[in-house]
């Protein structure tokens, strides 16, 4: 009998303790996390670590791309062709530099050299053409006009044909007695212009008594 009473008392005590713990847990759920005994215990055992924020990196100094590009272009131009290069050559080299990433170093060197050479040849050709035009436009003096017209008369008397029919033979006849050099096309153009100019002056009555105009008129 005593044993049964003891078991019942023990069972009642356990039931009371279980109910008490259950009430305590429900009460703790209503508390804020920092007031919850279980949360406080966990924080004491494993305190939170302070968060570290990465500092932003300073902006790296910007480089002047245009100045570097210009310096590299000038160095490459001097390296491959030396000095005294035309300005257009450096312009072409600068344009080619924008596609340098897609070429190997050897291919880029060949491409730059080719562009500079072509630009230099074009500039030289333009200068040479302008020089020839200016030279031939200013060489025909009054003495050359007289010699040229007299040579046409002599050639017709000696050969029995006019200079237009045998321009090559006429040039061979007068090339050593005039002060300029020209091909058959230039000779033909000069003779035609000389004729037109003389006819215009004669129609206007411009100084027909001068020595050169008299000799030209007589020829």
Curated annotation (Swiss-Prot):
Skewed-composition ranges (Acidic residues): 65-77
Ranges for region Disordered: 9-77
Basic residues bias (residue ranges): 17-30
Pfam families found in the cross-reference section: GeBP-like_DBD (PF04504)
Compositionally biased region (Basic and acidic residues): 31-48
Coiled coil, from the record: none
GO biological process: regulation of DNA-templated transcription
Record keywords, A-Z: Transcription, Transcription regulation
PANTHER family in the cross-refs: BNAANNG10740D PROTEIN-RELATED, DNA-BINDING STOREKEEPER PROTEIN TRANSCRIPTIONAL REGULATOR-LIKE PROTEIN-RELATED
Protein family membership: Belongs to the GeBP family.
Protein's name in the database: Probable transcription factor At1g55950
